[in-house]
Amino acid sequence: MSDEASETGQRYNGQPILKRQKPILPYICSTLDFQEERDFLAKSIFPRLNDICSSRGTYFKAVDLRWSAVKAHKSFTSNQFRQYSCLQSQHLKLSLDYVNRCFPFFIGLLGQTYGDFLPDYTPFLLSQVKDFESLSKGKKNLYIAAKNGYPWVLKTPNCSLTEFEIIQAVFRKKSQFQFFYFRTSNSLLRTFNEEEEEEEEKLSSAYLLNEQGKMKVGKLKAKIIGKGLPVRFYRDLEELGDMVWKDWSAVVEKLYPFTTIMGNIDYKHSFENLYHEEFVENCKQVFVTSKESNRTFEILERFAIKDLDLDLDTDSTIAGSGLDSILRINSLPTCKSILLLSGERGCGKSTLIANWVSNFQSKHPGVLMIPYFVGSTCESCDIMSVIHYFVMELQHRANGPRLEMDFLNEDSNVLVFSLLVEVFIAAISLKPCILVLDGIEELIGIYGISGQKAKDFSWLPRSLPPHCKFILSSVSSSLSCKSLCARPDVKIVELNSIGDEDTKFNIFRQHLSPADQERFGQSKPILRKKPNLSPLKLAIIASELQECKIYRNEFQCLREYLEVASVQELWELILKRWVEDYSWTLKPKDTTLDTVIPGPSGWVVDVLCLLCISHCGLAEDELLQLLDTMGYRDHHKVTAVHWAAFRQATKTWIQEKPNGLLYFQHQSLRSAVEHKLLGVSTPVRESNPNVAQNSVNHKKAHFHQVLMRFFQRQTIFWRVYQELPWHMKMSGYWEGLCNFITNPSITDFISKIQNPSLWTRLHLVHYWDVLLEAGNDVSEAFLLSVAKIEGEQFQKLKKRTTLSVLECSLSEITAADKGRIILFIGSFLKLMGKINEAEKLFLSAEDLLLQSPSMTEMLLRAQNAIGELYLEIGMTPKGLTYFQKAWSNLLRFTLSDLKISQELMKQKVKVMNNLAESAPGEFLKENHVLEYATEISKYVTGNPRDHATMKYTEGVLMLASGNAALAKLKFQECLTIRRWLFGNKNILVGEIMEFLADLLFFLLGENEKSQKKQAIEYYKQVIKIKEKADTVATCKLVRKHLSISLSDTLCKLAGQLLSGDFCHHATMEAVSYLYRSLDLRAAHLGPTHASIEGILHLLREIQRSRGRRSWPQSMNHLFPNGSRNGFSLWENVPKLNFHSAQSSDTVNTAMCMNIRRFQRVKSTQPSLVSDKPKYVPGKGKKTLAPILCKSAEEKFQRQASDSQIWNSPRRQPARKKAACPLKTVSLIDKNGLVRLSRQSVSSAELDSRKGLITSICRQPLQRPHNVDNPWKSISELVSEKWLFHTPQYCFTPQKPGFPRRSQIESKLLKTSDDPNKE
């Protein structure tokens, strides 16, 4: 990489790759008289701290357990009183648990009060406890805390809860992130004193007046100061807020220093990386080594490093070998490139693989390994997300962190599943790599394919590059496992039992707390009675025993849990305990439900169901707010303490992602919730939206409605975008979904995102498709939204301090905002095939931006977008006008401006490429576009897509200037880059392949035969690519254009085959291609088109020359009376008039003028330009001079229009009546050698019915009909203009007087469909 490119790459690459960051969770410790301070910090300071954390890949959340909110109510049931009693007795234990969970972060607020404490100085002894229920509240707390990991509390039993928390956080551990704030004035005590009478039952007067308490708090402050901890003194709330902000913003800065964060960046991929790292770390904490795990480790490592030995030290991109591997992929010998680790659910596959990945990466840091754990997040199960993640990681790792990956997020091809798979195949061919995909039985298909196809791996090629190793894990009974076992390249490793009894005990002990591990011996005899327990069962039971003993007899629970046969039954028992020990239900009058739903109920049930129904998970504060909206308020309120007790019991199985959202850690728990609590048989993520409305799924539909109403009122865009449209879809609320995606506020936010991720774009396209299927016109809704934006017609908003995302006003919208939003909507409509609507919006945006001189950068974006749209639908002269406008605007910016603006550089690349494809040679020379392109090409090496585009642009411009040899090199470099970006089946790759195949015949030299062979191979690959593109195209007119283009390629391939040695096999192959081309032209251009006439004439000449006996029987029936009678069918067919798609005054003119220069570059030998074909004496065969059926000069002019149509299968040209045919121009040198160039026809207006057709090269075509030498006649026919659908040419046979058409061929014509009847 050049210094200029390196400098530019550093400036451009503002998006850092986020690393795994632990959240900042300070524990808030204070006495009861600090409610006002806590409220102020929670509302004013902590949200600001969370904002700066969120931009650095983490979050800030203060843990504030407000025990004062926990009160008993006279309406409590007996079970609720039991819950209340258990909760009060674990006050100290739960607080210390959360102090440990929050370590090393701690905030202490101290004043003049100390808190409740035991006044008796007599030490409290556990051995003296005979009746737990007879103990006082304070002693119960000491007993529970001492029995659950905190025996040290018995050494100082006379401390208050506040001092116990401070001792645990500060004096038993060391940390630099602990801050104390001492209140120096008693003014804030007034509120507390005024409420003293109302709180007599809870706060006695002795609490404040006791001299012993004052002395204790004084000593505590002295100890804190004496330890050297940071202490701040404040007088009022504002001063406290400033101190807390200053201290904790400095903590954030120290832990996670500020990097160059670009605004409005979609960090979806970076966060996904964090989730998988977090999953590995969690599995490492509970992993237990055994003989079985060591054996499996060895198998996995041997498999992973096999065939990689020679490449372990290679750290650079092996582009050449990668491309070779792509080309060889179908001919590779069968090798074991996939390892499948299978086993029963719960046997420990995920934990084992996660630990092996960590172990392998530490042993072999130079080997490229990318792990992916399905289910590590709620949205990680979709197959499109999985493949996209692998591609992103492979490209980053293979090409360095500075590589810009915008091409994946910009290219519409990645929205098509089959094309994304091709990108994946290209990515794994870059260099040796090991991919790990755990839990494949949980894969689903939401956006690309069906869930069944995602699971059966039929999308994966039958063979992979030998240097790519794919390690998968699955449940033995799954569809994925059965499908993969049938593949010859899969090695099966069955994970059997966990090992001996000691291993089982170690797994059980690993999931116990340190205090419980000391009493583990009491559980051993019970566990020995169940020798076949899986690791998952052991983990579930062990983690459950830590908390259930506070509420019930732990050994009775253990026996009950061990009796169940399956994991599903075990979860049902545990869910039942959670509901009984932590939950309560609402009375019918308090609930928001219209009807009573049978089955388990209560807030714990509701929380689990909400988590299961959510699209991407829910945060703790969101769940508590949801419970409040569902009726859990007042004395039914779920307080922070109730929530803390529940989370402490479920922390192992309901975990937090790095962004703070909760999710189910194991699929078995999700399945149990779906089956037992929701009552559904189909997994929620795979269910149909319409099914939610059935009475059987009324509960599921209810929770979708609850979440939909909740997120309609939320203020954080990404959370709204993640959840709200999903629940609208699942609820069948089509009107609301349509209003959401066309809402100006939503559009405004998305349009600000500089590089939307695949996930963000997939959602928009997915919801469009869903609405379209439901019969909603989304494009019309977008146009109405634009009309409101332009007219500034916005609803009057209610006066509230905060507005939801959907209520945000655009009343103060600027001209730049309007232009940005309209351009975004226009681009999206164009992507979805709404060309007419997109054109109107682009033109409207240009008019708007022209009125604002300061909006030059956005204006050139609009002008370039308009030009590309016109180029796509064939209106090249109009498109050129806008490209020239954009070029003029770009000249206002200096090279320095381009270096510091990524968007400007991208626009420069696009405009130069579009000019090269549409502008005349004079314009390009006068404006020195080639010199500009050469300079700009140095600065885009960091963006592979733009780099390839510039190579292509340079090649076209060099070809226009006559340097064909150097142009060919540029095209080959472009092909190399596009191959390793997109694979071998992308239409962009096909285009450059076809271009090179055409160009080869201008540069035939000593290796003429090998070049012909390469060109033929290129043509065959292009045909496959175009056939594939046709299958994914949804627009009828797009398929028509693809079919016509395919017809041309078939003719070119046939022409090259016939220009060879005329062996029987090559001739028959050429004839088959001609017949395919004939069928396509008859279907799409009409049976009266002149090119059909010419192809039939060529086929008859081939038949006559080869003889009837060698002609395929299937073809003879078309000509029962010989070639003359058959040809009479087309005698009086009129010429079909087409409209133009391209200007004749383009670079093609320059290339036609320089054709002789190309010949000189090719060779100076006179034999190559002889007007006579080469003849091999005695062989009876003649080798024709090279025939270029579709020239390289013309190919680049259709690059933009064809590629954009091909790239987006959804796009529909705006005017269906306008076809875009191509005319053929014959090029004849001074020696009479026939060369063909296919040139697009020109027209000033696509709408006019009469196109002005301008011939670039007007030399008359000499076509003597040689009866004595049939092969010479065929070579002339192959070189004719009618071989392509030329609008200006009408085939006229040399010999007049052909007989009338036969009745058989007349019937064939009558049955042909009129292509214009669409």
UniProtKB/Swiss-Prot annotation:
<keyword id="KW-0963">Cytoplasm</keyword>
<feature type="repeat" description="TPR 2">
    <location>
        <begin position="653"/>
        <end position="686"/>
    </location>
</feature>
<feature type="repeat" description="TPR 1">
    <location>
        <begin position="401"/>
        <end position="434"/>
    </location>
</feature>
<dbReference type="InterPro" id="IPR007111">
    <property type="entry name" value="NACHT_NTPase"/>
</dbReference>
<feature type="repeat" description="TPR 5">
    <location>
        <begin position="993"/>
        <end position="1029"/>
    </location>
</feature>
<feature type="compositionally biased region" description="Basic and acidic residues">
    <location>
        <begin position="1302"/>
        <end position="1318"/>
    </location>
</feature>
<feature type="repeat" description="TPR 3">
    <location>
        <begin position="819"/>
        <end position="852"/>
    </location>
</feature>
<dbReference type="GO" id="GO:0005737">
    <property type="term" value="C:cytoplasm"/>
</dbReference>
<keyword id="KW-0802">TPR repeat</keyword>
<feature type="region of interest" description="Disordered">
    <location>
        <begin position="1295"/>
        <end position="1318"/>
    </location>
</feature>
<feature type="repeat" description="TPR 4">
    <location>
        <begin position="860"/>
        <end position="893"/>
    </location>
</feature>
<dbReference type="InterPro" id="IPR011990">
    <property type="entry name" value="TPR-like_helical_dom_sf"/>
</dbReference>
<keyword id="KW-0677">Repeat</keyword>
<feature type="repeat" description="TPR 6">
    <location>
        <begin position="1047"/>
        <end position="1084"/>
    </location>
</feature>
<dbReference type="Pfam" id="PF05729">
    <property type="entry name" value="NACHT"/>
</dbReference>
<protein>
    <recommendedName>
        <fullName>Tetratricopeptide repeat protein 41</fullName>
    </recommendedName>
</protein>
<dbReference type="InterPro" id="IPR051191">
    <property type="entry name" value="DCAF12"/>
</dbReference>
<dbReference type="InterPro" id="IPR027417">
    <property type="entry name" value="P-loop_NTPase"/>
</dbReference>
